[in-house]
Amino acid sequence: TLAKLTTRDEERILAEDINLKIRGSEKICIIGANGVGKTTLLRKIAEELSQRDDIKAEYMPQNYEEILDLDMTPVDFLDKSGDKEERTRIRTYLGSLKYTADEMEHPIRELSGGQKAKVFLLSMSLSGANVLILDEPTRNFSPLSGPVIRKMLREFPGAIISISHDRKYIDEVADLVYVLSEDGLKLLQ
């Protein structure tokens, strides 16, 4: 619950009376006009959930590339243990996301925007998170990658709170769609 959503400098109220409840592994998508405060709301949700001990939330901002180590290969970036079995498992996941063996060994900086996003999303899902908070998760995907990512997110066992303008993502991944406006956050029936 948020009484009012303001800009970062708190100069302007973007929306008031925001209530959002998530049950279990619900997949929620927030839509609304550009500039209404969707990203600001998502940041606040991420901040709030990161404070809780009963939830492990991971946040994917629109500018996620700043968080990736672009000099590492996808396998090295995703491998936290150095264990041979873990590296094999990571390669299998990457293969299921349409990576070639060659792409798995290239520095992340040489990959397409969609391939970088897949690395980031996979790192989130391998982290043990039970809530993913995603700001425009499909914006960099090619028509070939989109279905694979939507399926991966649909099958994620935890909850997802996201913002998207992608109609296919909304239709295939979201259980509930909310509209953010100056009047607050309303469930789309």
Region annotations inferred by a language model:
Residues 1-189:
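ABC ATP-binding cassette signature C-motif
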